[in-house]
Design a protein with these regions (language model features):
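An acidic/histidine-cluster motif and surrounding catalytic segment
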Residues: 1-96, 100-117
Length: 117
């Protein structure tokens, strides 16, 4: 199997150590290196940063209901991952949630994507 060359991160809240252990075990089992990306806890963000990331008014015009804090934190965590990619020289970034269940074929898929470079 070709060595995976795409960076891979998993989003994980500081308090969820069991989830971290589980995803790290799955990645190790598949032979994939992964880096923990600390998840954003929405309530801990300063209001000024919250307003840069989310607008209740814009959301209301586009969707049926406002996002709850957990959804906003998830969204902000993914933005953090995009920023990490943009700050790097990598052509792509694999972003996982810490509660994902990886299939045995996942490493092959990542390697196939990496081979497209």
């Amino acid at each position: 199997m070709q060595k995976q060359t795409l960076p891979l991160v998993f989003i994980n809240l500081d308090k969820d150590s069991e989830r971290r252990t589980r995803i790290e075990g799955q990645l190790a089992h598949l032979g994939l290196p992964g880096e923990r990306l600390p998840a954003v806890w929405w309530k801990h963000l300063p209001p000024a940063e919250q307003s840069l990331l989310y607008s209740a008014e814009r959301n209301h015009g586009l969707y049926y209901q406002p996002l709850v804090d957990g959804e906003k934190g998830c969204y902000a965590s993914h933005i953090q991952a995009w920023r990490q990619l943009l700050a790097s020289d990598a052509p792509a970034l694999v972003v996982l949630e810490d509660d994902v269940r990886l299939t045995p074929q996942f490493a092959d898929v990542v390697n196939a994507i990496a081979a497209l470079q």
